[in-house]
C-alpha cells in the first residue's frame, strides 16, 4: 500500500492537531482562535437584526434529531420564519425536513469513502474507472462544471489524501514526510500524480449521455495507482462545500423559501434573500505579517454567493487542510495540477456574485488565486462577468465593485 492511502476512518472526528508553536507565534495563535470562533458561528454578522426569543423571527434551522449521516455539521442555515405571515413553527419544521433530506443526500453524493444503495456517488465512480455510470443530476452538474472549467485539480485525489496525512501530523518531522517541498519521495510522488492529472489521455471525465459519466483512466495510471495503493482519483476536497452549499440553497429555494442564508464554516455563503429589504454583513480579515487583522465588515443585499480563498486556517474544516510549521511556513489545500504543490497568490481573496452560485464563482476565480500574485486587471475582467473581488494591497482594501460598502472596525 502506498503511504498516501487514506485512512478509511478519516472522515470520523479526529484528535485536535497538537503543533508546538514557538513563542513568537503565540500572538498569531490567539488571533486564529478568535477567527475560528467568528467563522465557526457561520462567518456572518447580521447587522440588521436581533434574534427574537418569540415564535417569529430569525432562527437557526437544524436537521432532524436522529437523522442519518449528513453534511450539516459544516453549515449553518438561518431563516426568518413567520415573516410571510404563515405559522413560524410550521415553517421551521418544513424547512428542517427539506434541509435534512438535502444534507443527507449531499453527504452521500460527494462521499469518496463509501458507497450507498440509493445513489451512485464519487466513491462508486472512483472504484469503476472506464465504466459508464448514471448519476444524480446534482453530481452530474458538479462534475460537468469542473470539467468545462478545465479545473484539473479535481484529479489530484491521491495528493489530497497525502495532504490530509500531513495536516494530521503531530509534529513537523512527521509532517515533512508528506511534504513535496521537504521530502524527496513526496516530491517524486507529487510530480508523478500531477503529470497524470495534467494529461487528458491519462485521466478525464467523459459525459456520454444524460446524467451519464465515465471516469477515463489510462492503463499506466491504473497500474501506478495500484502500486501506490490509491483509493480515489477524484476528490472535490476543499471545493466540495461550494458545491454542497449550492445544492442546499437550491433545494430550499426550490421549495419557495427565500428569506434565509446559509454559510459554511470555511467561508462560503449563499444569501437567498431577494427582497432587497435587509442588509447583510460579511467580516473582512487580512493576514499582515503574523497577525490576522479585522478590517470591518462588507455590507450587501441578497441574493449573493460569497467565496473566501485564504492562505491560513480560518474555520474548523481547515484543521485537516492546513498545516503550520514552527517556523511559520503554512501548507494550504490549493494544490495545482501543474506540479502537485500548493500555490496562493495572496493571504486572502473574497469573490462574490449575485448572478452565480458559489461553485461557478469559485471556478471563475480559482486560477487567479493560484497565480504568482493577484492581478487587479484580471480581477477587473471577472467583474465584467458580475463576479466581484475584495483583496488587500499594503494593508489597504482593494475592490472591483463600484457599489462596495464597508463598515469600519472600531479601534
Predicted feature locations:
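Mature catalytic core of soluble alpha/beta enzymes
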Residues: 2-411
